Structures are given as structure tokens and as C-alpha cells.
Regions:
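N-terminal accessory/capping or targeting/presequence segment of soluble
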Residues: 1-93, 104-105, 109-202
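Short glycine-rich phosphate-binding loop at a beta-alpha junction
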Residues: 97-102
Length: 202
């Protein structure tokens, strides 16, 4: 099963002239408890943190010390297991053109992990999702928390941000972390079975 998935992933490399593709554990909301476990799908690794790099001929799984034994049990048949710290220094991928879904990485991660020794191509579709057939994400409703619980309503919080923007002569602010949006708007949701934080940006 994993071998078939890896082949389907590699079959997409030619379209983007890729030498490899990087798959993180987190989703676009940087939650380790994602409804889309792309890393688990392509590697069979079920830990809460890690990266897979699939090249044209080899597969690598980077995990930290918590998961070394687990990764060997779950993924060593198809992947070489490497300590997570070595992703910063490894020359395995030197001069390779690695494809990434930019929504799944911070700019710092891209600079530190990949641009140091490689070229990076931002792929405008997720190559794992192309073979990971799941139901479309359901739009779950949010619910609001009362001021008695939060201490301030969302209008009061937004007014503070607007005052800051005016003071700093800024036009807008982008809030990427769902937990910060949840705090600002006093909302919670049902997107995750393990957390009340809704999947959102602002």
C-alpha cells in the first residue's frame, strides 16, 4: 500500500520538474492533530512530529528522539529514519529541487531547512492530497463565548488592535494562528476532536 502511494507521488514530480517532495506532520493551521494526516498516509508514521522527504529514488523520515523506535517499527520498511536535527545539516538533498506546499511551512523553516543546500519549488497544489482521497473538509460552525467567561467582548479586543494599528500607521494585521483568532473573537469550534480551537485565519 505505501509503495503504491509513493509511486503515485513520484509520478507527479515530472509535472513540476521536482527531485523530491517534503511532507510535514502539521496541516495548514499548524495543528499536530490534523484531520489530514498526510505524513501518516505516505509513511505510516503515526507520531505527532516529523518530516518526510521523498526523492526520486529514496525516502527519508526525520523524527526527534521521542519517536526513533516508533518510526523504525512503523516506517523503516520504506524509509530511512534520520534524527530530526540532521535535517539542518544533511547534504543528502544538496542541489536538489524540492517541492513544498508553502501553506504547511513558516518562512523560517523554508530558509533554515531547505534553501540552505537546495532549490525549492512552491507547488500550487498538495501532491499528497492528489492521492489522499478524503471527504472535503466540513465547514463546522463556531460558537461564541460570553463576556462573563472571557472578561472582554470581541469588539473591545478589536478596538485595542485598531488603536495599535493607527498608532503604528499600519493598514492591517494578519493573524495566522488559530488560537489567537479564537482569543480575539471569543470563539471556539468543532474542527478537532481534541481541541476547541477552530481552524481559521484572520
Amino acid at each position: 500500500m505505501i509503495e503504491i502511494r509513493l509511486k503515485k507521488l513520484r509520478d507527479q514530480f515530472k509535472k513540476y520538474n521536482l527531485d523530491g517532495y517534503v511532507v510535514p506532520k502539521n496541516d495548514e493551521f499548524f495543528s499536530e492533530y490534523s484531520n489530514k494526516d498526510r505524513l501518516g498516509f505516505i509513511s505510516n508514521f503515526k507520531g505527532s512530529a516529523g518530516y518526510a522527504v521523498i526523492s526520486k529514488n529514496k525516502n527519508y523520515l526525520f523524527v526527534d528522539g521521542r519517536y526513533t523506535i516508533q518510526a523504525k517499527i512503523e516506517s523503516s520498511k520504506n524509509f530511512k529514519i534520520i534524527d530530526y536535527k540532521e535535517i539542518l545539516d544533511t547534504k543528502i538533498f544538496k542541489n536538489l529541487n524540492l517541492g513544498i506546499d508553502a501553506k504547511l511551512f513558516t518562512s523560517d523553516q523554508i530558509k533554515r531547512f531547505f534553501l540552505k543546500n537546495n532549490r525549492v519549488t512552491i507547488v500550487n497544489e498538495n501532491l499528497i492530497d492528489n492521492i489522499f482521497k478524503t471527504k472535503k473538509n466540513k465547514l463546522n460552525p463556531f460558537y461564541s463565548l460570553d463576556k462573563k467567561v472571557t472578561g472582554e467582548n470581541h469588539i473591545q479586543k478589536i478596538q485595542k488592535i485598531l488603536s495599535f494599528l493607527r498608532k503604528e500607521r499600519l493598514d492591517y494585521i494578519f493573524v495566522s494562528a488559530p488560537e489567537n483568532v479564537a482569543w480575539l473573537l471569543n470563539i471556539r469550534g468543532y474542527d478537532s476532536p481534541t481541541s476547541p480551537i477552530p481552524n481559521c485565519h484572520l
